[in-house]
Amino acid sequence: DWTXWSXLVXAACSVELL
């Protein structure tokens, strides 16, 4: 189930990029 992780992963990626 990546539906719930999609948000967390995206947020984590955005924070790491920033």
Curated annotation (Swiss-Prot):
Any single biological process term in GO: killing of cells of another organism
Keyword tags: Antibiotic, Antimicrobial, Bacteriocin
Function: Bacteriocin, active against the Gram-positive bacteria L.monocytogenes, B.subtilis and other Bacillus, E.cloacae, L.acidophilus, L.lactis, P.acidilactici, S.thermophilus, and several Gram-negative bacteria including S.cholerae, S.flexneri and P.aeruginosa.
Stated name of the protein: Bacteriocin thuricin-S
